[in-house]
Amino acid sequence: MRRNFDPDDYALVVKLRADPPRPWRWEIYCAGKRLPIEHSEAFFETRGAANKAGKQALSQLIAKLSV
Protein backbone atom coordinates (compact mmCIF):
# COMPACT_ATOMS: atom_id res chain seq x y z
CA MET A 1 0.00 0.00 0.00
CA ARG A 2 1.21 3.49 -0.79
CA ARG A 3 2.36 5.60 2.08
CA ASN A 4 -0.26 8.12 3.23
CA PHE A 5 -2.92 6.45 1.06
CA ASP A 6 -6.41 6.71 2.53
CA PRO A 7 -9.32 5.40 0.45
CA ASP A 8 -11.64 7.77 2.33
CA ASP A 9 -9.90 10.68 0.57
CA TYR A 10 -11.59 9.68 -2.71
CA ALA A 11 -15.22 10.43 -3.50
CA LEU A 12 -17.58 9.73 -6.37
CA VAL A 13 -19.88 12.52 -7.55
CA VAL A 14 -22.51 12.26 -10.28
CA LYS A 15 -23.22 15.53 -12.06
CA LEU A 16 -25.59 16.84 -14.70
CA ARG A 17 -23.10 18.08 -17.32
CA ALA A 18 -24.87 17.94 -20.70
CA ASP A 19 -28.22 18.15 -22.44
CA PRO A 20 -30.65 15.22 -22.67
CA PRO A 21 -30.87 12.44 -23.65
CA ARG A 22 -27.51 11.64 -21.97
CA PRO A 23 -26.80 14.41 -19.46
CA TRP A 24 -25.13 12.54 -16.57
CA ARG A 25 -21.45 11.81 -15.95
CA TRP A 26 -19.47 10.56 -12.96
CA GLU A 27 -16.43 12.31 -11.52
CA ILE A 28 -13.94 11.16 -8.89
CA TYR A 29 -12.47 13.73 -6.54
CA CYS A 30 -9.56 13.50 -4.11
CA ALA A 31 -9.58 15.46 -0.86
CA GLY A 32 -7.84 18.79 -1.27
CA LYS A 33 -8.22 18.85 -5.06
CA ARG A 34 -10.59 21.28 -6.71
CA LEU A 35 -10.87 19.42 -10.02
CA PRO A 36 -11.81 15.78 -10.56
CA ILE A 37 -8.92 13.35 -10.90
CA GLU A 38 -11.00 11.10 -13.18
CA HIS A 39 -14.32 11.35 -15.01
CA SER A 40 -16.39 9.29 -17.38
CA GLU A 41 -15.72 9.74 -21.06
CA ALA A 42 -19.29 8.69 -21.85
CA PHE A 43 -22.45 10.37 -20.65
CA PHE A 44 -25.37 8.40 -19.22
CA GLU A 45 -29.15 8.58 -19.64
CA THR A 46 -29.84 8.26 -15.92
CA ARG A 47 -28.17 9.33 -12.72
CA GLY A 48 -28.41 5.74 -11.48
CA ALA A 49 -26.51 4.37 -14.48
CA ALA A 50 -23.78 6.98 -14.04
CA ASN A 51 -23.58 6.21 -10.32
CA LYS A 52 -23.25 2.46 -10.93
CA ALA A 53 -20.46 2.94 -13.47
CA GLY A 54 -18.76 5.50 -11.23
CA LYS A 55 -18.76 3.15 -8.24
CA GLN A 56 -17.04 0.53 -10.36
CA ALA A 57 -14.45 3.07 -11.56
CA LEU A 58 -13.83 4.26 -7.99
CA SER A 59 -13.31 0.68 -6.79
CA GLN A 60 -10.82 0.06 -9.60
CA LEU A 61 -8.94 3.28 -8.82
CA ILE A 62 -8.70 2.49 -5.11
CA ALA A 63 -7.50 -1.05 -5.88
CA LYS A 64 -4.85 0.35 -8.23
CA LEU A 65 -3.66 2.97 -5.74
CA SER A 66 -3.55 0.59 -2.79
CA VAL A 67 -0.95 -1.72 -4.38
Each model region followed by its residue ranges:
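Short arginine-rich
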Residues: Q56-V67
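Acidic helix/loop or adjacent segment enriched in Glu/Asp that either coordinates divalent metal
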Residues: T46, A50-L58
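Short N-terminal "domain-start" leader segments
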Residues: M1-R25
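Compositionally biased, intrinsically disordered low-complexity segments
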Residues: L16-R17, S40, L65
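A short, exposed loop/beta-hairpin motif centered on an aromatic-Gly-Thr core
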Residues: L35-A49
